């Protein structure tokens, strides 16, 4: 699928982005290059390769789970403008 300046304008509209018409051709060229690289990756033979999350089979050392900061919930709730049942009350923003 080739991307032209019309497709760039449609996608920019859907994404609520402003794209200058003079930049549209350069942007479509770059997007076509990206799609060509993706197509090249899709042509790679991966038969017999197990799915993996990371190319290296190593595990990260984990630090001990130690409390490093005090719980200041009560102090924060004490200065909140409105609290109910231990929770902050905020104005409704969605009807």
From Swiss-Prot:
Enzyme class at the top of the EC tree = ligase
A single MF term (Gene Ontology): asparaginyl-tRNA synthase (glutamine-hydrolyzing) activity
What is the reaction catalyzed?
Answer: L-glutamyl-tRNA(Gln) + L-glutamine + ATP + H2O = L-glutaminyl-tRNA(Gln) + L-glutamate + ADP + phosphate + H(+); L-aspartyl-tRNA(Asn) + L-glutamine + ATP + H2O = L-asparaginyl-tRNA(Asn) + L-glutamate + ADP + phosphate + 2 H(+)
InterPro entries the UniProt entry points to: Asp/Glu-ADT_sf_sub_c, GatC
Q: Where are the transmembrane segments?
A: none
UniProt keywords (A-Z) are: ATP-binding, Ligase, Nucleotide-binding, Protein biosynthesis
User: GO biological process: any one?
Assistant: translation
Query: What EC number(s) is this enzyme filed under?
Result: 6.3.5.-
Pfam families xref list: GatC
Family to which the UniProt record says this protein belongs: Belongs to the GatC family.
Q: Which NCBIfam families match?
A: gatC
Assembly mode: Heterotrimer of A, B and C subunits.
Tell me the function of this protein. Answer: Allows the formation of correctly charged Asn-tRNA(Asn) or Gln-tRNA(Gln) through the transamidation of misacylated Asp-tRNA(Asn) or Glu-tRNA(Gln) in organisms which lack either or both of asparaginyl-tRNA or glutaminyl-tRNA synthetases. The reaction takes place in the presence of glutamine and ATP through an activated phospho-Asp-tRNA(Asn) or phospho-Glu-tRNA(Gln).
> What is this protein's record name?
Aspartyl/glutamyl-tRNA(Asn/Gln) amidotransferase subunit C
Q: Which gene encodes it?
A: gatC
